[in-house]
Amino acid sequence: SARRSYADLIAKPFMPDDEKYNYYFYDINAKINHKFSDRSRLYLSAYNGKDHFATQYDDNSDFKDGSKMNWGNTIISARWNYIFNNRLFSNTTVSYNNYLFNVSAYSNNQYSLTNNTTFINRYSSDYRSGINDWNYQIDFDYNPSPMHHIKFGAGYIYHRFRPEVMTSKISDKVDSEAFRDTTYHSMNNSRIYAHEVSA
């Protein structure tokens, strides 16, 4: 199954030519299962969703700017169900999750100076962060009698964080002569790893 918002498509013809706004989201779901036998069955599922927001201003003269914001999730999962007997069955699950957040902006300014020269300033920035998870889980359900129900299992999650990756660029020039062209990078752009165990 899939769906997408369409408010942006309806609003687009009514926006001014020099100013644009755009927002939409979508998500996609897919599921499939396979029966190997009366005791064994495999379930596969996948999900992808994204939100997008953008602005743009361009008056076809000396000033342009815009920004974008995107965030979304991707999840893939496989689960194997096995029945040992009428009292005991298990579920073994392997899943992957990816989340990404991104914000970017730009501007382009142009000015005419008094000495018949043109000053141009350009700026852009990009910010990203995200997380990846690998999850391994096994769960057992045991019914020794109609009056008792026992659940037990174990799990492991491998986390990989990508925090605060930031890049900014600034450039200035007069006519064709550049006197500033600088790129800044954030200091905290290394990945962080973590392990989580449960039982």
Stretch-by-stretch model annotation:
Residues 33-51, 70-199:
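Face-selective signature of the C-terminal outer-membrane beta-barrel domain
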